[in-house]
Amino acid sequence: MSSPRAVVQLGKAQPAGEELATANQTAQQPSSPAMRRLTVDDFEIGRPLGKGKFGNVYLARLKESHFIVALKVLFKSQIEKEGLEHQLRREIEIQAHLQHPNILRLYNYFHDARRVYLILEYAPRGELYKELQKSEKLDEQRTATIIEELADALTYCHDKKVIHRDIKPENLLLGFRGEVKIADFGWSVHTPSLRRKTMCGTLDYLPPEMIEGRTYDEKVDLWCIGVLCYELLVGYPPFESASHSETYRRILKVDVRFPLSMPLGARDLISRLLRYQPLERLPLAQILKHPWVQAHSRRVLPPCAQMAS
């Protein structure tokens, strides 16, 4: 749904935003889609959180329960004009069935004559991309924590036969405690066979098999974790070049240039993920057990997830 480096932002953090997020801990969550049909009149609409090609995202509160959400409002005319009805239905179908502390919840959805409304979890600290822009690069502890959260969330997705295919800083939001929330499932796909052959995703993050049009599976997400880890630590993606053709060439040759400042443990992890052959990439379970991740991650599960486990 989003173009590279231009995505809808679900939360530009404001001081009031954290208070609203805290209030949600005691507020009643939105009822499931089967309970009753919602309309826009059920919400108090607040400030805009972001704008995109197909619509806008607003901070909103359910009048009945006072539960704080991000309300994504999409224009049907724009979606139909781009022929993205199927992609939107797929995004809703997939995200509505995913419940994990590091995946942005889609609580409910409804539509009227002109718009489609997605009721999403509010991520008060906004995009990881914005944090990276502000800091230029992240330290080992922050990066390792994000990688552990991401690997755990993707393990959950892959167990449900869901491939995300577009992991990148713009599609990772930050919760109240700074925990990662995978968002934007517009490119993701649910496939029982876990094997696809369509081109999608962001150029800097595309794995070799997708560039070459080969059949691929869930291991495309492993490649993306490697690219993300590099970008978080260095400040730019490993294959970033002056032209698309040069980026493609470097990806296909797996031409990774590690700066001298790259920690050896992180370099080892990235090297095990950025492999031309998908079967050679480090599995998610091994990412979670990797010595560098184990040594530096400070992942803290939210209370609800701790109780569930």
UniProtKB/Swiss-Prot annotation:
GO terms for molecular function: ATP binding; protein kinase activity; protein serine kinase activity; protein serine/threonine kinase activity; protein serine/threonine/tyrosine kinase activity. SMART domains: S_TKc (SM00220). Component of the chromosomal passenger complex (CPC) composed of at least BIRC5/survivin, CDCA8/borealin, INCENP, AURKB or AURKC; predominantly independent AURKB- and AURKC-containing complexes exist; in the complex interacts directly with BIRC5/survivin and INCENP. Interacts with TACC1. Its EC number is 2.7.11.1. Residues 43-293 form the Protein kinase domain. Its main location: nucleus. GO terms for biological process: attachment of spindle microtubules to kinetochore; cell division; meiotic cell cycle; mitotic spindle midzone assembly; mitotic spindle organization; positive regulation of cytokinesis; protein phosphorylation; regulation of cytokinesis. Okadaic acid, an inhibitor of protein phosphatase 1 (PP1), protein phosphatase 2A (PP2A) and protein phosphatase 5 (PP5), increases AURKC activity. AURKC is also stabilized through its interaction with INCENP, which also acts as an activator. Keywords: ATP-binding, Cell cycle, Cell division, Centromere, Chromosome, Cytoplasm, Cytoskeleton, Kinase, Meiosis, Mitosis, Nucleotide-binding, Nucleus, Phosphoprotein, Serine/threonine-protein kinase, Transferase. Residues 292-309 are annotated as: Interaction with BIRC5. ATP binds at residues 49-57, 72. This is Aurora kinase C. Residues 22-32 have a biased composition (Polar residues). Isoform 1 and isoform 2 are expressed in testis. Elevated expression levels were seen only in a subset of cancer cell lines such as Hep-G2, Huh-7 and HeLa. Expression is maximum at M phase. Transmembrane segments: none annotated. Induction: Expression is cell cycle-regulated, with an increase during G2 and M phases. Belongs to the protein kinase superfamily. Ser/Thr protein kinase family. Aurora subfamily. Serine/threonine-protein kinase component of the chromosomal passenger complex (CPC), a complex that acts as a key regulator of mitosis. The CPC complex has essential functions at the centromere in ensuring correct chromosome alignment and segregation and is required for chromatin-induced microtubule stabilization and spindle assembly. Also plays a role in meiosis and more particularly in spermatogenesis. Has redundant cellular functions with AURKB and can rescue an AURKB knockdown. Like AURKB, AURKC phosphorylates histone H3 at 'Ser-10' and 'Ser-28'. It is linked to Spermatogenic failure 5: An infertility disorder caused by spermatogenesis defects. Semen from affected men show close to 100% morphologically abnormal multiflagellar spermatozoa with low motility, oversized irregular heads, and abnormal midpiece and acrosome. It is found in: Nucleus; Chromosome; Chromosome, Centromere; Cytoplasm, Cytoskeleton, Spindle. The keyword Nuclease does not apply. GO terms for cellular component: centrosome; chromosome passenger complex; condensed chromosome; cytoplasm; kinetochore; midbody; nucleus; spindle. The active site is at residue 166. It comes from Homo sapiens (Human).
